[in-house]
């Protein structure tokens, strides 16, 4: 999102779970600037205000070691749009059952994104792999998904969500330009090095099964996955069948969930 705004000539203040905190930068934020903020469930759970534009890419079990149950986790996510007004915009994932169920609570303009179906308003991926935006004014074909530099169908979904969120603020031409140039973020399928014919990738931000599976589907080659870390008390059932080769473990979660041949 920040790259799109920067390409459009806007001054952007970026804050998220990794990197510099945004609050100390508040004195530098002018009314015409844009703040792009990634918010965790820990921050959302106590929020009583919502942003002008809210994008929820998907919801899957996570951080259940910190939340009393899955419903509390989902309710925290809902605060992203619960306090919006009629002039706000909310973008939800049509393909995710949990985010689809949030639609009835949205107060502002609702937009969808989907890689599986044509939506009535928002963005979608057609059967030829072309990204589209559709609304009351018509259906605009944007660019083939092969133009997206970073790998993985989950990144196609991310671009669909972002385009729906920024439509009207960024030109269609810039969407394609940034898609070709954006190389991704640290720790998310980040290429580290190639050694003895083996390419090493850092996907350590994939700290739940849904994100890990998305990373696995980003590659056509055979993989060796080293997984583990802190156990967040979430179900791992879906991950086992997806790991079809070797697996190694490290950290608290390694032994109980170590995959076998």
What are the language-model segments listed below?
Residues 1-94, 98-108:
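Phosphate-binding loop of NTP-binding sites
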Residues 2, 162-163, 257, 261:
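A generic structural signal for short, well-ordered alpha-helical segments in conserved domains
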Residues 13-15, 107-126, 176-180, 190:
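Beta-strand->loop->alpha-helix junctions that form or flank phosphate-binding loops
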Residues 17, 115, 228-230, 253-255:
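Cofactor-binding loop segments of dinucleotide-utilizing enzymes, especially the Rossmann-like FAD-
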Residues 90-94, 226-227, 245-257:
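Short internal beta-strands
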Residues 96-101, 118-121, 233-235, 256-260:
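Short, charged/polar "capping" segments at the starts of alpha-helices
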Residues 124-143, 185-193:
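Acidic-glycine-rich active-site phosphate/pyrophosphate-binding loop
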Residues 145-247:
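Nucleotide phosphate-binding/pyrophosphate-handling subdomain across enzymes
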